[in-house]
Amino acid sequence: MVKVITYGTYDLLHYGHVRLLERAKALGDYLIVGVTSDTFDRERGKINVQQSLMERVEAVRATGLADEIIIEEYEGQKIDDIKRLNVDIFTVGSDWKGKFDYLKVYCQVVYLDRTSGVSSTEIRSEQQVVRLGLVGESPILNKIERESQYVNGLESGKVFTLNDTYLSDSLKRPSQQAASYQDLLDDSDALYVISAPEKHYVQIKEALQKGKHVLCESPVTMETEQWEELRQMAKDRKLVLMDSIKTAYSVAYYRLLLLAKGGVIGDIISVDATCTSLVDFDPTQDSQKSLYEWNSICAWGPTALLPIFQLLGTGFTSKQIATHFLDEHQKYDAFTKISFVYPHAVASLKVGQGVKSEGSLVISGTKGYIYVPAPWWKTDYFEVRYENPQNNKRYFYQLDGEGLRYELLSFLKAIRTGKDFSYVSGDISECIIKVIADFEARKDMVVI
C-alpha cells in the first residue's frame, strides 16, 4: 500500500483545495491530510485564517478524500509524521516547489500544479475592505499603519492629528492628512483613537453617531457613566467599540494567564506589575504639548492594571494610591503606585513617565511564581519558577507586531461577524476607567 501525505490550512475550503486533494489521492492508495492548528498558523504569522481548526478539519473530512486526518502543531513535524506513519510520498502545491526537497531523504516528494485563479487569500480579499482612520498624537499611529498591512481586509486611511511630528513620512503626506475630524469620519469605516483621553468620549460619540466602528486606546473614557453610555450606543447601532490594550493579544501573555489560572503556581496570592518610561516633557514649559500629552496613570495604568484584573478580578476590597506630580495643577504624575487588597490576595502596580524601574511582572502563588522580564508588556518569554530550581520551566512565543497585529485582526473579525472578539472584557475596561477616575478625583490618594 502506497501512503501519501499532504498538509495545508484549508481555510474556506474551495475547488482548488479539492482538486489538489484529488490529485494527491491519485498518487497512492492511502491519503493522510495534515491540517495546521490555530496556534501553529499564528506562530508562522498566518493570522488571517477565518475558520477554526475543527471547522477546517470537518471541511476536509466532508470531501471524502482523506483516509486519515492529523493535526500539524509544530515546526519539523513533517519529518516525524513521515517516519511514524511510514509515508511513501509527500506532496504539496507547486507554489512551494523546492521548499520541501529536504524531505527527499525520507520519502518521494511530488509538487502538484495548483488550480489557477482560486485561493483562500483571494476569497478573503474579495470581502469589502474596512478603511481605518487614525486619530491622535502618538508614534503608535505609525505602528497601526504598518501592522494593518498584515490584516486582509483592513486598510489604513487618513489621519487627524494636532501634531504631525510623531508621524512617519507616509502619514505626513498631504493626501493622508484629514483637514478636520469630520473629514476623517466621512472618509473612514472605522477609527483607531489615541488622542488625549479627555477627548475620547466626544470623539467616540461622534464616530458612533456617524455609524463608525471604534478601536480606542485605553482608557476609553474618563468616567464610567460615559463608558456605559457609549457601550449602549454601540450595541444599539450594532457597531463595535473595543478597548485597545495590545498586551492582551500577545500569545505569550495569553498563555501565562491560562497557566496561572490553571493552578501551575498554586493559588495566586500576589500580582505585581511595573511599567515605566522616561518622557521628555515639562508641563510647566510646554503648554501646547500639554493639550495632548498623556499623564502616567493614563499612559501606563491600563496596561499595568490588565494582569491584576484578569487574574484576580475586579472585586478588590480596598486600594491606596501614592503619586508624585510634575506640575502644581497636579495633572501630570511622574510616578504613581497603587496597592490593592482582595479577600484572598493583594496586588500592586507602579507606573511612571518621570522615573525608571525594572519593568517586570511577577505573579506569586502558593507553589511557585511566574516571572516576566522587562518589558513584560511586550511578552514573548516568561518563566515559571519553584522552590527547587530543577523544576523551573521557560516558555518562548513569537511576538509579531507587539500584539497590535492580532488586536487589529480581532477588531476586524468583530466588525464582520458582529461577535465580541476582544481580549479585554467590558467589566475590566470599566474598572480601569473607575480606578483612573478615582485618581483624577484624588480618592484614596496620598501625594508624595
Regions found by a protein language model. Name each.
Residues 33, 216-217, 241-243, 372:
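Hydrophobic residues in well-ordered beta-strands that form the structural core
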Residues 248-319:
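Predominantly a Rossmann-like dinucleotide-binding segment in NAD(P)-dependent oxidoreductases
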Residues 299-378, 409-419:
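Contiguous beta-strand/loop segments that form the cofactor/metal-binding neighborhood of enzyme cores
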